[in-house]
Amino acid sequence: MKKNWILLLLLTFSLASLSAQDALYPNTFPLGDVRITAGPFKHACDLNVKVLLQYDTDRLLAPFLREAGLPKKAETYGNWEKDGLDGHIGGHYLTALAIHYAATGNLECKKRMDYMVSEFARVQQANGDGSICGFPNSKKFTEEIRKGNVGIVWNYWVAWYNMHKTYAGLRDAWLYGKNEKAKKIFLKFCDWGVDVISNLDDRQMERMLDNEFGGMNEVYADAWQMTGNPKYLDTAKRFSHKQIFDSMARRIDNLDNKHANTQVPKAVGYQRVAELNSKTAPDYNDFMTAAEFFWETVVSHRSLSLGGNSRGEHFPEAGKCSDYMHERQGPESCNTNNMLKLTEGLFRMHPKVEYADFYERAMYNHILSTQHPEHGGYVYFTPACPSHYRVYSAPGKAMWCCVGTGMENHGKYGQFIYTHDTADNALYVNLFIPSELNWKEKKIKIVQETDFPNEEGTTLTVNPSKATQFKLLIRYPSWVEQGKMQVVCNGVDYAKSAQPGSYIAID
């Protein structure tokens, strides 16, 4: 591709101030306020809705009903859903329904989402203690953890990781799907978790967290933001595995040969704690540094050009990237899903082009390609091994972890195209994707028309319904050469003195 980029703006607005967004994630537009209008990302999202609706909701709920002693309405799925990780896809599926309802307005997604929330309420009530678990012998697990027998985690297939998917699904049904019942269930589930680990000392917590636990620190940070209750912040910090956290906070890379997608969600949690913590808190800098250094380390030293990382699910030793050439299990899709979450979070705090550049690279080259463009199956591994190939899932047959994140991925493409900064009264254009933004607080609609990457340009049209004021910031990608970017508005090129890897401002 020629390194030449032209962006035309049709602006007819006068210029006031932004009201704060009432959202879990600051400076992020509600997913339903951004519509992708054409191109491969719209195709992927629309196709994914069709794939999601091929799954049987009752079969996904069956493990939870079984563990609560309730009659099943259908048989559970096979594969990983019957091998000890029972229920993990149910949480992912709830998130996916909520996201795709927000992204497309599909009412069947909403109907299924609301049904799952109601069923989880039944499960929680039947359990009587606030828990919602789908993995076998879950009550025994809880009893042993309460007694301090944390070694029990090794007798289960990543139980806390599994539960995290349900936590996240309930949070997302509230966040994206506007289901208030889901929030109540989520917080009650959080209270159960606080109670279960309440008698564990720091040594026991560390032993327990040696086993994969997903993003438990992330969801407890979210619970803290929802409620302001400090017990959730305390729990988020307790779920921040010190073995990784302490090294990252000291800017020490200790990731060699560690299971990659065990580590990435931890860093997502570090970022959430830093984002929500007071900058005057004594541990603020540690959480911030841990999140930033983890991102820098993985992106700059442990990722391939497509934005993915890991071989055989583990980070190779530093300097041994040749391992990728001999391993059929290349970068794992789940890892990139979580790296994009981390990138979004860091960008919310410090909107740097390097974050947007990585996001674009990983989304186009890895995440988009993990969906089969015809039947919509999902990919686990993307091998870099010469002459190798990828395997795509079939609905209801393969129930891998990357099926779960794959269900979610293709509804979130609109989440990072545009962001805003309330303090700076600014709108960021981060990605060049045909789309429409309904900026309700400003009473403005913004239309982006482009066929990127098949054409080297995009057009933004700003249509205000009232006089308003804001700063428009357009990404100058690092891959565009110096002097080759043009941002033309009313005949004026605002990019003349701009540098690659920056944002071009129109005030």
Question: What do these predicted regions represent?
Answer:
Residues 1-22:
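Bacterial Sec-dependent N-terminal signal peptides
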Residues 21-507:
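Glycan-recognition and catalytic cores of secretory/periplasmic carbohydrate-active enzymes
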